[in-house]
Amino acid sequence: MGSAQNERIPSLTRWYIDTRQLTVTNPSLPLLEALQPSDQEAVKRFYHLRDRHMSLASNLLKYLFIHRSCCIPWNKISISRTPDPHRRPCFIPSPALTEATDEPIPGIEFNVSHQASLVALAGTIIPQSHGASPNPTTVFANPSPSSVPAPSVPQVGIDITCVDERHARTSSAPSTRDQLAGYVDIFAEVFSSRELDTIKNLGGRFPADAQDGEAVEYGLRLFYTYWALKEAYIKMTGEALLAPWLRELEFTDVIAPEPAPAPGQGSAENWGEPYTGVKIWLYGKRVEDVRIEVVAFETGYIFATAARGAGLGAESRPLSRDAGVAVSVDRWMHMEKIDIDRDIAPCATGVCQCTKKQP
């Protein structure tokens, strides 16, 4: 696995861990002892093994990103949180760590999500050319839905939804258009009237009287796509689902990503084709500076990523492949699968070369 970033060119790292097989085969908590005691206790507070594994994977991803991005020893890492009420995980180097480090420790921005045994992280290094790195507690003290604290400050959000999880846990998943409409209406405080109508109407993809399973299934995928988009955006700002402007944030031109093809049928490690055509509106005005995309993983998962600031927003979209036009390098890295034994264990146990100075 390559380094997290090229520090001179901000890029968006995106990693994920799939804990499903771990939960089936391993009742233990690998590398738990490599976390700080408070993080170990947080993992063990979960009752179900799969929830423990997701919490563990979330911590391991955060530690790995901090370790690789900031080039500090694993055992010196500690996770901080932004002020109440949001309590967003962040990294604030302690004065002792800063004094003991020869090189300046770069500021970083990251966000994590977990759902149905999958855990994902999106993160970036704050460019050092912009002077002193801002303190995350300051950046997210007063979250703004419409703008970054400063153009040089990146903000990222990521979210995972699972279309199949409701089917697996209950027998009450909607099976008709009327049931779908009733289910969607439960979330009237989250979605705008236009978004609710679009979901109920299946985005105009099916006839108004279509009642078959395919139509309802698409409606559920569309609902979870909207949910992932909204979560990714508000997490990018540092807010939560309690944000008072939730219904004023609207997404249009939304298409539920098709389930990813089976392995060997053109898919890249079970990933579908990212959809980037979503338009964002806030208080009725078009949001132009945010880049957002959704992509399907396997048949049941939908990932959404949002970013703005420091060249990672809308301006970071790669150029088209029109004849005679060079294709720019995409600053958004593809989703990369992280293996606990292969990728994390060497760093967590101190045998990696991440903190060694290059000759």
UniProtKB/Swiss-Prot annotation:
Protein's name in the database: 4'-phosphopantetheinyl transferase A
Biotechnological and industrial applications of this entry: PptA is a druggable target in Aspergillus species that can be targeted in a selective way. Its combined role in both primary and secondary metabolism, encompassing multiple virulence determinants, makes it a very promising antifungal drug target candidate.
Presence of the UniProt keyword Transferase in the record: yes
Reported consequences of knocking out the gene: Leads to the loss of the green conidial pigment and decreased viability of conidia. Impairs virulence in both insect and murine infection models.
TM region(s), chain numbering: none
Keywords of the record: Transferase, Virulence
Organism superkingdom: Eukaryota
Reported function: Acyl-carrier-protein synthase that transfers the 4'-phosphopantetheine moiety from coenzyme A to a Ser of an acyl-carrier-protein. The 4'-phosphopantetheine (4'-PPT) portion of CoA provides the essential prosthetic group for a number of carrier proteins and multi-domain enzymes, priming them for the acceptance of acyl building blocks in fatty acid synthesis and many aspects of secondary metabolism mediated by polyketide synthases (PKSs) and non-ribosomal peptide synthetases (NRPSs).
Single GO MF annotation: magnesium ion binding
Family recorded in the similarity comment: Belongs to the P-Pant transferase superfamily.
Reaction(s) the record says it catalyses: apo-[ACP] + CoA = holo-[ACP] + adenosine 3',5'-bisphosphate + H(+)
The protein's Enzyme Commission number: 2.7.8.7
Pfam families per UniProt: AASDHPPT_N, ACPS
InterPro entries the UniProt entry points to: 4-PPantetheinyl_Trfase_dom (IPR008278), 4-PPantetheinyl_Trfase_dom_sf (IPR037143), AASDHPPT_N (IPR055066), P-Pant_transferase_sf (IPR050559)
GO cellular component: cytosol
GO biological process: 1,8-dihydroxynaphthalene-melanin biosynthetic process; fumagillin biosynthetic process; fumigaclavine C biosynthetic process; fumiquinazoline C biosynthetic process; gliotoxin biosynthetic process; lysine biosynthetic process; lysine biosynthetic process via aminoadipic acid; N',N'',N'''-triacetylfusarinine C biosynthetic process
Description of how activity is regulated: Activity is inhibited bythe antifunfal copmpounds PD 404,182, 6-nitroso-1,2-benzopyrone, and calmidazolium chloride with IC(50) values of 3.9 uM, 35.2 uM, and 19.2 uM, respectively.
